[in-house]
């Protein structure tokens, strides 16, 4: 039996989370899985997909609106398949040091993980360019600009997901 493709869907405002989704997709492909990486707002159906990884940037304590909308729109279908969630956003190294439950602004993400019976919910550091525009990004960039993503940690998380899918796809 052929495994249905894995969908990696994401909500990203400035491109950092989109790049993380691609890293996750690459790690899954390296484990011989078929993967599609798409912006969450462009996904119209989960038909033809198996496991789903859904990620979104965290802004001011909220998960990206496209990730939230995706989770609401496909909630019942997501509860019927393996699902993993991730958030990106702390603009420091706290995501590498603390459990998601101890990170500020992750409550909504964790509630969604519970509602969808996600197998895991990870939080990774984010990225904010010094020249970010708009409020509150421009104000935050003055003191917290930088790339706090940890590609090795993200790829290791994806590698663990691949092992779970290859061992027990349902």
Predicted regions and their residues:
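Short loop/edge segments at beta-strand edges and connector loops
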Residues: 39
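Short, hydrophobic/glycine-enriched beta-strand segments
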Residues: 6-10
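FMN-binding flavodoxin-like domain, especially the glycine-rich phosphate-binding loop
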Residues: 2-5, 19, 26-27, 31, ...
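Short polar catalytic/cofactor-binding loops
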Residues: 11-15
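Short amphipathic alpha-helix with an adjacent loop that forms part of the alpha/beta core around
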Residues: 42-47
């Amino acid at each position: 039996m052929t495994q249905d493709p894995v969908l990696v869907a994401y909500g990203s405002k400035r491109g950092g989370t989109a790049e993380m989704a691609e890293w996750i997709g690459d790690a899954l492909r390296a484990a011989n899985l078929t993967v599609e990486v798409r912006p969450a707002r462009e996904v119209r159906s989960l038909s033809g997909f198996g496991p789903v990884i859904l990620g979104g940037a965290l802004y001011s304590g909220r998960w990206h609106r496209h990730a939230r909308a995706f989770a609401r729109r496909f909630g019942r279908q997501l509860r019927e398949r393996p699902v993993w969630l991730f958030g990106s956003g702390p603009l420091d190294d706290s995501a590498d040091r603390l459990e998601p439950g101890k990170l500020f602004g992750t409550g909504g993400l964790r509630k969604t993980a519970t509602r969808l019976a996600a197998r895991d919910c990870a939080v990774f550091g984010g990225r904010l360019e010094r020249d970010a525009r708009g409020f509150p990004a421009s104000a935050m960039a003055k003191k917290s600009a930088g790339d706090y993503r940890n590609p090795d940690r993200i790829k290791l998380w994806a590698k663990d997901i691949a092992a779970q899918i290859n061992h027990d796809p349902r």
